[in-house]
């Protein structure tokens, strides 16, 4: 199943649902960064969460940043996701591996450890909206659900999953169910949803069973006037970094430091944190940057 996002409503518009398949883009992140099993799972869940949050934004070009700063072995992570379906991200210590949990699965909570989740929503103008919450357990899903409940006052359930073996990422994705204000006043509806979600066996198991997103939503909300909205949106791992952007970033070092790079290294090398692309700057390019800086001074 191709990476995609679908939206749906139920209960007369009182329930909002968004589902994403992120298998290929999670595999791409694993390949680009050389991620361990537990780092792949942590970043894969976080990228799915970022795309789910970005889906609620209205203005073209809007993006959501998720940053986790924590004390665990992974050292935190960063995700940048857009309404357009693009996402990128990285883990501070991508190669770290730890013992699996008692179920034999990657122990994301222990690998992340205690810390904070910072969420920034940027619509492309004005000041971005930012919010910070303490991590609940480092498993990503519960942490994002807590952010939604505390910062946006929206009762939400978020299911995130990544399944991988030694051949790579087999399945990844997520599901966000939100009870909107008009429906949140119906305790029976809220209780019914909570019961159904609690009985799900895990999102990745549903994907591995061969069910697609509409089928999963039908099982969960089909008797509540489920409506699938429009066509699926394609998703992909994408980083806008370029050689020219790298050269622009080098200017912040200033002319003296650039001269030092020429003298000591005969050029410069920069690696993009988000996609691990390596860029080289020649002596001639550094000299041109120095000239630009001195002309502007």
Swiss-Prot record:
One GO location term (cellular component): cytoplasm
Chaperone listed as a keyword: yes
S-S bonds: 239-241, 272-275
Single GO biological process annotation from the record: protein refolding
Segment forming the signal sequence: none
InterPro entries for this protein: Heat_shock_Hsp33, Heat_shock_Hsp33_C, Heat_shock_Hsp33_N
Gene Ontology molecular-function annotations: protein folding chaperone; unfolded protein binding
Coiled-coil positions: none
Pfam families assigned: HSP33
Keywords attached to this entry: Chaperone, Cytoplasm, Disulfide bond, Redox-active center, Zinc
Post-translational modification comment from the UniProt entry: Under oxidizing conditions two disulfide bonds are formed involving the reactive cysteines. Under reducing conditions zinc is bound to the reactive cysteines and the protein is inactive.
Function recorded in the entry: Redox regulated molecular chaperone. Protects both thermally unfolding and oxidatively damaged proteins from irreversible aggregation. Plays an important role in the bacterial defense system toward oxidative stress.
Xref: HAMAP family: HslO (MF_00117)
Protein name per the record: 33 kDa chaperonin
Annotated organism of origin: Synechococcus elongatus (strain ATCC 33912 / PCC 7942 / FACHB-805)
Organismal lineage: Bacteria, Bacillati, Cyanobacteriota, Cyanophyceae, Synechococcales
């Amino acid at each position: 199943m191709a990476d995609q996002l679908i939206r749906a409503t139920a209960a007369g518009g009182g329930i909002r649902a968004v589902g994403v398949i992120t298998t290929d883009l999670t595999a791409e992140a694993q390949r680009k960064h050389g991620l361990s099993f537990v780092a792949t799972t942590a970043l894969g869940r976080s990228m799915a969460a970022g795309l789910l949050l970005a889906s609620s934004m209205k203005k073209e070009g809007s993006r959501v940043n998720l940053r986790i700063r924590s004390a665990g072995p992974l050292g935190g992570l960063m995700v940048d996701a857009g309404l357009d379906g693009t996402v990128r991200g990285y883990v501070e210590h991508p190669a770290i591996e730890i013992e699996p949990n008692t179920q034999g699965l990657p122990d994301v909570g222990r690998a992340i450890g205690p810390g904070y989740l910072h969420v920034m929503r940027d619509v492309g103008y004005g000041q971005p909206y930012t919010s910070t919450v303490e991590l609940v357990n480092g498993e990503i899903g519960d942490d994002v659900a807590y952010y939604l409940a505390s910062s946006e006052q929206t009762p939400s359930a978020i299911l995130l999953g990544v399944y991988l073996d030694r051949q790579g990422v087999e399945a990844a994705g997520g599901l966000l169910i939100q009870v909107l204000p008009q429906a949140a006043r119906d305790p029976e509806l809220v209780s019914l949803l909570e019961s159904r979600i609690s009985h799900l066996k895990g999102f990745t198991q549903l994907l591995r069973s061969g069910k697609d997103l509409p089928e999963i939503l039908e099982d969960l909300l089909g008797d509540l006037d489920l409506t699938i909205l429009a066509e699926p949106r394609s998703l992909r791992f994408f980083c806008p970094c370029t050689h020219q952007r790298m050269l622009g970033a080098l200017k912040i070092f200033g002319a003296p430091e650039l001269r030092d790079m020429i003298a000591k290294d005969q050029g410069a090398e920069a690696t993009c944190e988000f996609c691990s692309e390596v860029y080289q700057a020649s002596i001639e390019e550094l000299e041109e940057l120095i000239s630009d800086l001195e002309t502007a001074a």
